[in-house]
């Protein structure tokens, strides 16, 4: 019976959602459908995440476009960015799990080891945007942001792979490293002249960064000498971790798709054998940053099925996506479940799409249309967005 239900649901998903928003015969025979009372989309004017509380749950807040450029220079999920471009604004919903996370971050004890917060949930529930809500909070309150927007990009489809000059057992990814350095500089430029490196770093026979030099010189080395970009990333992470307890800055380590650090890669050596994640210099250094053996900040991680390699599409629990090695490496952590929309959140999202004329079908704004969208999407944020986009 379960198999039959599963097949039925999969067929429903494949149908054109417009066919469900039908014009019934009875409706055409009756008088004109009475217009529904106007509703105002649930919004808050507070664009500062620090001011968000339980009273804002389910409301949308606007990320200033300037913040979008500096805090998220790499962009946000593609379909979300399509909405930003279409609507001319970047709005995030204030959700209960994000409020829980913000509460923890507001009360961070910087004298204690960094706490690891792990966002998990089924596919499409909004883990990435909840993580971005936390990143925006920290950026607005002068934290130094070390953000990896998609760790899976480091373990597959690498554009260039070189043997490490620092360690012959590992491999460098200069293009991925230089891209990350560019975005890191955009977000944290005000810190790069203040933080001084604690060691001398030799890049080649002619170039070196002297002890006491601004950290920005290391970043520039990676940007101007792309071959050194991977080593530059390693130096940046090492220096930030070593200096985080000095009180010069508060450090947020945010990694989306952290399960990629302990999964399998698609990258191959010259003998055609697969490269293990720990053989990649970027992964090796990032694993050090998600350890809780440093002070002066917090670690916010998310699990992701999107882009995950060789994992079941239905897997979403930490032990399923991290595996034994990854789970043991991150334990202890504080898990935060990101669920599907509750009724209030669904209604807020639905009204937001209506307000922005994202729903063009004539029956979409009716109670019948609302119920069918709720049924088809199962209140899953990603599925709701995809259904609404096709209407």
UniProtKB/Swiss-Prot annotation:
It is found in: Mitochondrion. Keywords: Acetylation, Apoptosis, Hydrolase, Mitochondrion, Ribonucleoprotein, Ribosomal protein, Transit peptide. It catalyses: GTP + H2O = GDP + phosphate + H(+). It is an enzyme of class 3 (hydrolase). The modification N6-acetyllysine is found at residues 168, 200. Its EC number is 3.6.5.-. GO terms for biological process: apoptotic mitochondrial changes; mitochondrial translation. Pfam families: DAP3 (PF10236). As a component of the mitochondrial small ribosomal subunit, it plays a role in the translation of mitochondrial mRNAs. Involved in mediating interferon-gamma-induced cell death. Displays GTPase activity in vitro. This is Small ribosomal subunit protein mS29. It comes from Mus musculus (Mouse).
């Amino acid at each position: 019976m379960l198999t039959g239900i599963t097949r039925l649901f999969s067929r429903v998903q494949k149908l054109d959602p417009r066919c469900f928003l039908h014009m019934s015969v009875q409706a055409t025979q009756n008088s004109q459908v009475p217009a529904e009372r106007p509703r105002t989309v649930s919004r808050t004017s507070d664009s500062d995440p620090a001011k968000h509380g339980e009273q804002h749950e389910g409301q949308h807040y606007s990320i200033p476009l300037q913040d979008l450029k500096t805090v998220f220079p790499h962009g946000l999920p593609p379909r979300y960015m399509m909405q930003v471009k279409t609507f001319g604004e970047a709005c995030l919903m204030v959700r209960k799990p994000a409020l829980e996370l913000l509460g923890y971050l507001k009360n961070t004890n910087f004298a204690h080891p960094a706490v690891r917060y792990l966002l998990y949930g089924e596919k499409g529930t909004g883990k990435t945007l909840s993580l971005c809500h936390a990143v925006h909070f920290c950026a607005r309150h002068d934290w130094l942001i070390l953000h990896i927007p998609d760790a899976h990009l480091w373990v597959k489809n690498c554009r260039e792979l070189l043997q490490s000059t620092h360690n012959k057992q590992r491999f460098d990814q200069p293009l991925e490293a230089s891209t990350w350095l560019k975005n890191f500089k955009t977000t944290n430029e005000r810190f790069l002249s203040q933080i001084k490196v604690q060691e001398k770093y030799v890049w080649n026979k002619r170039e070196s960064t002297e002890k006491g030099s601004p950290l920005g010189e290391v970043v520039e080395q990676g940007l101007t000498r792309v071959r050194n970009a991977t080593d530059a990333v390693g130096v940046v992470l090492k220096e930030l971790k070593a200096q985080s307890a000095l009180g010069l800055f508060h450090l947020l380590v945010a990694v989306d798709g952290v399960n990629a650090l302990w999964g399998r890669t698609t990258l191959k050596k010259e003998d055609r054998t697969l490269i293990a994640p720990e053989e990649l210099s970027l992964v090796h250094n990032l694993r050090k940053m998600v350890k809780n053996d440093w002070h002066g900040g917090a670690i916010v991680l998310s699990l992701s099925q999107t882009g995950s390699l060789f994992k079941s599409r239905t897997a979403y629990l930490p032990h399923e996506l991290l595996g034994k090695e990854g789970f043991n490496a991150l334990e202890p952590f504080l898990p935060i479940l990101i669920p599907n929309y509750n009724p209030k959140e669904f209604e807020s999202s639905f009204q937001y799409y209506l307000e922005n004329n994202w729903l063009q079908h004539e029956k979409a704004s009716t109670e019948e249309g609302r119920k069918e969208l709720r049924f088809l999407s199962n209140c899953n944020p990603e599925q709701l967005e995809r259904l609404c986009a096709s209407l």
